[in-house]
Amino acid sequence: MTTVGEALITLLEAHGVDTVFGIPGVHTIELYRGLARSKIRHVTPRHEQGAGFMADGYARASGRPGVAFVITGPGLTNTITAMGQARADSVPMLVISGVNATPTLGKGLGHLHELPDQRGMMEKVALFSHRITGADELPGALARAFSLFSSSRPGPVHIEIPTDIMVEPADGISYLPTNAGPPEPDAAAIAEAAELCASARRPVILAGGGAKKAEAPLKRLAERLGAPVVQTTNARGLLYRHPLGVPASPSLKAVRALIAEADLVIAAGTEFGPTDYDGYGDGGFVPPANLIRIDIGADQLARRPATVSIQADCAEAIEALLGRLDGPAASGDGKIRAAATRKAALAELSPAFTAQIRAVETIRDALPGAIIVGDSTQPVYAANLYYDHDRPGGWFNAATGFGALGFGPPAAIGAALAVPEAPVVCLTGDGGFQFTLPELGAALDAAAPVIFVVWNNRGYREIETSMLDVGVEPVGVSPAPPDFCKLAEAYGIAAERLADIGHLADALKRARATGLPYVIEITVD
């Protein structure tokens, strides 16, 4: 007999899943029955929040959904922060949990791990939450999840299986293929957008995370129109060192001026989030008069109306738009405008920010093609303002949007397992590192060769600065850090401490040469 738990593993394999992150418990043992016989790799984090963040990092690095297995109740609630981050950043994540036996649900009988309404709670953060009530539901629920991931704006999905359903017979249930894809670009909208492009003299492209797989057509469109390309945080790595690239945040006044002076703005895969566009100051982000929006999500297009809205995958829409553009390529001043904006944007930054950006550039240059996974720490904040990365999708962090501390270490582990050929660096602070520091053990178990770079400024210095800026005496911002090198060594992981950031490049190369997890602590005044 094949149980529902065993069938789940078979169906996940059929959907292309090769890795799951999870901590087994008494309510999910049946989910593990089929794992030993499958090709799916199981990675055991030290906390379920780590499972969620690992699934997130895996998804961002690979482009495939990250999957987490967690127990009923506390195991699931521990993943909510990670699911919130995935929801904010449109990351495909499938969280599969147990739930108490069907006859007991909602009765408050005091069973182990019981919640009053687990699925109702998850519906508030997941794109959808589905309870399996019988074996025959399982293929359809999974097909719905994977169809959503490929056809619209992705995010976290939750499927729960009651303990009594997990052990039910599931012989004869079969895989349901998912043929769903994003909608085709509307021909009339493409034609209207092409007309706007043809008449534009000062166009600008805004690229968001939804455009990170569209580098080739995006580059051709930028060159065709002579349009500077502004990259939000999740789009960094596009058009690396290209003369039309502007790897700077629209929060900077120079970038906002570039956008304000444009006679056409093409926004590709960006939600216009306040943390990317400084919606909190300077009067908020002023939408341009002529705006073309390309987004896979209809809800996103509805939130900020445009002159022309195109619901489609960014790469497909841009290819369609290029096919409608006639005449010679632009010979305008796009490269001049881009260069002037880059120069002015850098001039806005303080010497401290500039030094922190140089530290990130040191990582990039020492390890070409690296994936740098950031936590909320000073050099990450600085680089989110201005930083040019050399790999599309290779710079991501949780310092914008939902802004969860502790994201970096487990997300970097997920990324390293997804793309084992790439160097992976976790850039974290001493405060944020302590949120998920035990995942060093998971990195060692999984042989994930993450280089953990710890920016140790002995506290929450960014929060301290914010307090001082508004006249609040700093309180609670100086938690004493441990000796990170000794902690790493306790896990069996090599570590070194740097007092001079000038030695960082050599340390990174030493770390990479080991092929193992490694900790580099940088002490900062």
What residues fall within each predicted segment?
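N-terminal alpha/beta PP-like core and its mobile active-site loop of ThDP/TPP-dependent enzymes
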Residues: 1-325, 362-365, 449-452, 488, ...
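Active-site diphosphate/adenylate-binding microenvironment
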Residues: 5-8, 23-36, 337-421
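Conserved structured core elements
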Residues: 25, 215, 256, 312-315, ...
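A general structural motif
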Residues: 47, 107-112, 180-192, 211, ...
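Thiamine diphosphate
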Residues: 104, 108-113, 259, 301-302, ...
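Phosphate/pyrophosphate-binding active-site segments
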Residues: 136, 287-376, 499-525
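Active-site-proximal loop/turn and secondary-structure-junction residues that shape catalytic pockets
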Residues: 163-165, 378, 524
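Active-site flanking residues adjacent to catalytic metal/cofactor-binding acidic residues
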Residues: 268, 294, 374, 429-430, ...
